[in-house]
Amino acid sequence: MALKQSYYDLWFVSFRLLSTSGHRDAIHLKLKRNQNLPPEIAEECKVRSQDPFSLLTECNRDYFTNYPVSTEFLLTARLTDREGGTMFFYSSYRWQAIDVVKRIALPLFQR
């Protein structure tokens, strides 16, 4: 049975997967570091020995396709899982982001 956790407003960042095996898209969202996690999420991740900042996010696919990598999204989401599966964050595909911050990728070398 899926986790029964509350929804929270959390920051996520888009990134490119190193391996797309088993995934529909190469771009995904993960929890942005350096934010305070609700105790409910922190405790569940600790119990399952999971790094909350490495979990993927199920949400509106527009965030993968219509924004550049490294864009940050403030979403209403919750921690959940599927029976026998790994945990992930869920935000309904019908919901809009509360805030979006586009990041410009800088070149590796500057003159």
PLM segments and residue spans:
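Short, contiguous, well-structured surface segments enriched in hydrophobic/aromatic residues
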Residues: 26-49
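Short, structured beta-strand/loop micro-motifs enriched in basic residues and often containing a Trp
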Residues: 49-59
